[in-house]
Regions:
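A short beta-strand-loop structural module common to alpha/beta enzyme folds
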Residues: 1-8
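Catalytic helix-loop patch of NAD(P)-dependent Rossmann-fold dehydrogenases
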Residues: 42, 49, 53-57, 77-120, ...
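Hydrophobic, aromatic-enriched interface-forming segments
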Residues: 128-133
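Ser/Thr-glycine-rich phosphate-binding loops at phosphate-binding pockets of nucleotides
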Residues: 35, 74, 103
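SDR active-site strand-loop-helix element
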Residues: 3, 28-32, 69-75, 81, ...
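NAD(P)H-binding glycine-rich loop region in Rossmannoid oxidoreductase-like domains
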Residues: 10-52, 61-63
Length: 133
């Protein structure tokens, strides 16, 4: 079941528990995120609400129904290295430079609180439109 933005406010932990508990999915793939990188510096609370605290709520809800949580993260967890010629590896040390990258790294940590999790680090996602799937 692909939920559009209007189907679940991931920053509302009660709604997250309700929807996950009702649907009882085998897996949850969280593609939702605060992606306004520059705005994250001036609105860190809103950024953290979506990229960290919402992931913690998803992890708790997934634990409640024994669902796999797949958390989509970002290459921003690594920061910037203008001299780097190779892609990052999963065991490279993160070092975010800004609030957006730090919030995505914190979201990864939140996902790891549930043993049945996977983290996918990517540099971008797209869909058919801004309204969701």
């Amino acid at each position: 079941v692909a939920l559009p933005r209007s189907g679940l406010d991931i920053t509302d932990p009660v709604a997250v528990d309700d929807v996950i508990g009702r649907l009882r999915p085998r897996a949850v793939i969280n593609c939702a995120a605060w992606t306004a990188v520059d705005k994250a510096e001036t609105e860190p609370r809103a950024c953290r609400a979506a990229n960290e605290h919402a992931v913690a709520a998803l992890a708790r809800a997934c634990r409640g129904v024994d669902a796999l949580l797949v958390q989509v993260s970002s290459d921003y967890v690594f920061g910037a290295d203008a001299t780097r010629k190779l892609p990052y590896r999963e065991d490279d040390s993160p070092g975010p430079l800004g609030e957006y990258g730090a919030s995505k790294l914190a979201g990864e940590a939140a996902a790891r609180t549930w043993e049945r999790h996977q983290v996918v680090r990517t540099c971008g996602l797209y869909s058919a439109g801004a309204a969701g799937p």
